[in-house]
Amino acid sequence: MYQIEQEKTPQEIILHLLLVLFPFMVLHRAVLLWLNNTYLYDWMEHRHYLALWFTLGIVSFVQPKFAIVASYGYVACVVIGERLGTLILENNKLTATPEDYIMSCHGKLSHQGLWIWFQLYFTVIVLYVAYARQIEPRIKARRERRGK
């Protein structure tokens, strides 16, 4: 499934690294400037942000397409998860009962953005792997039959 592509020039390697790390740099800067008091962004920065940058940077040497899809998918899923989690939390606060405030650590008054992010990101990765294993070989075979 995973084959190392042909030798790349240093310019191609740098370009792949920049393409992989660009969405993280933009998200990090946006969090520092405008979104600094939000739940999911703070959680991501304090937990594994740098490790993910490093891991995807290394993966970009072996599988550049996967690394690009993973990085842009990650950023999109974080943004969607944060926004949907905040909307769900605000909506649940409007309809909360006193009993809901007692169990606020794991109930309808907790921020669901982390789980939304995780499910969306898992879906993005599964869809890419399915595309890479099933659809992409068919497209290549069809192009070869046509002589392109």
Which residues make up each language-model segment?
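Short, charged juxtamembrane terminal tails flanking transmembrane helices
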Residues: M1-E7, P137-K148
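N-terminal signal-anchor transmembrane alpha-helix
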Residues: M1-L52
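Interfacial non-cytosolic loop connecting adjacent transmembrane helices
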Residues: L33-E45, G81-I116
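Central hydrophobic cores of alpha-helical transmembrane segments
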Residues: F66-G81
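Alpha-helical membrane-associated segments of multi-pass integral membrane proteins
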Residues: A96-R143
